[in-house]
């Protein structure tokens, strides 16, 4: 797309004031002509890290309506639609093209261009090479609250048959713990820290508490309630798990109505409904 006149100034001068961020969403500068687009992009990034791809897509799309040349919003559309169906193919390709064109322009911050590069590496070269790109990104911009979490997501390699975490798993835990020391209220970091223990042989009480903190960071997050339900189920609290999945269901329905989204695009609702049914069965109800 043709760059607007403001773009030459955007790298040096950010919008002076943006609307307040929702609970649990961390601040990061976003190059945009619209102060209102910045929190939308950051909400979208938080949704990506908490497994809410369609919600993320809606936020990034809303940001693009305010600023069609927002590089990070195009990046977000590409990220959130990676696993989407063929009905999103055209939009995914168009945003990828726009992201690549904008990332070549020196008016955009190097930080944002690095995000575009890391995504390109992921798509073209796979997760192993992408890990290197994300590591460089988070090491180069240590104040970025999101880069270490995307890196941690790629590092995850689970546990072996004896319950020992893999090297990537241990490094991911270390990274997320570092983020939480600096930003204890980060919903994305709390969610990621709990998620890292999801496939552990035994769920310790500390992990359940971390999942509860992720819910407290943003009580309107259906993903956080769903994740809490997983841990309550794993620890034998089937009634508590059912209640958590029901809360996730309700929030999914509320989101459908407020965003006018068809249920077919709300896969989180179906996941929560299925897990709640299993929890109810295990609870003997």
Model-derived regions: residue spans:
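Alpha-helical segment of the N-proximal tetratricopeptide repeat
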Residues: 33-62, 66, 116-126
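Residue-level recognition of tetratricopeptide repeat
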Residues: 36, 69-71, 110, 143-147, ...
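TPR-repeat structural position
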Residues: 53-54, 89, 127, 169, ...
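Structural motif corresponding to the intra-repeat A-B loop/turn of tetratricopeptide repeats
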Residues: 50-51, 84, 124-125, 158, ...
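Alpha-helical junction/boundary sensor with strong preference for TPR arrays
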Residues: 67, 81-84, 102-106, 141, ...
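"A position-specific structural signal for the A-helix of alpha-solenoid helical repeats
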Residues: 42, 76, 112, 116-123, ...
């Amino acid at each position: 797309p043709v760059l607007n006149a403001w773009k030459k100034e955007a790298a040096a001068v950010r919008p002076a004031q943006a609307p307040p961020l929702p609970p649990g969403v961390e601040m990061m500068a976003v190059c945009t002509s619209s102060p209102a687009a910045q929190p939308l992009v950051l909400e979208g990034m938080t949704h990506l890290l908490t497994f809410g791809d369609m919600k993320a897509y809606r936020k990034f799309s809303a940001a693009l309506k305010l600023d069609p040349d927002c590089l990070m919003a195009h990046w977000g559309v590409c990220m959130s639609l990676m696993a989407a169906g063929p009905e999103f193919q055209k939009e995914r390709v168009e945003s990828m093209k726009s992201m690549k064109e904008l990332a070549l322009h020196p008016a955009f911050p190097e930080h944002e261009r690095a995000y575009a590069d890391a995504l390109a590496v992921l798509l073209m070269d796979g997760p192993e090479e992408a890990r290197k790109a994300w590591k460089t990104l988070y090491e180069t911009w240590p104040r970025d609250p999101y880069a270490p979490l995307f890196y941690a997501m790629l590092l995850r390699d689970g546990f072996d048959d004896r319950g020992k975490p893999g090297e990537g798993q241990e490094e991911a835990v270390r990274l997320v713990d570092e983020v939480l020391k600096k930003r204890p209220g980060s919903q994305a970091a709390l969610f990621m820290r709990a998620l890292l223990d999801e496939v552990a042989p035994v769920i310790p009480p500390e992990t359940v508490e971390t999942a509860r903190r992720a819910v407290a960071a943003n009580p309107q997050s259906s993903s956080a309630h769903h994740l809490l339900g997983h841990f309550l189920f794993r620890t034998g609290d089937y009634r508590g798990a059912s209640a958590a999945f029901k809360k996730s269901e309700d929030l999914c329905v509320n989101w459908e109505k407020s965003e006018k989204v068809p249920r077919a695009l709300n896969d989180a609702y179906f996941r929560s409904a299925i897990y709640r049914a299993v929890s109810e069965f295990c609870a003997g109800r």
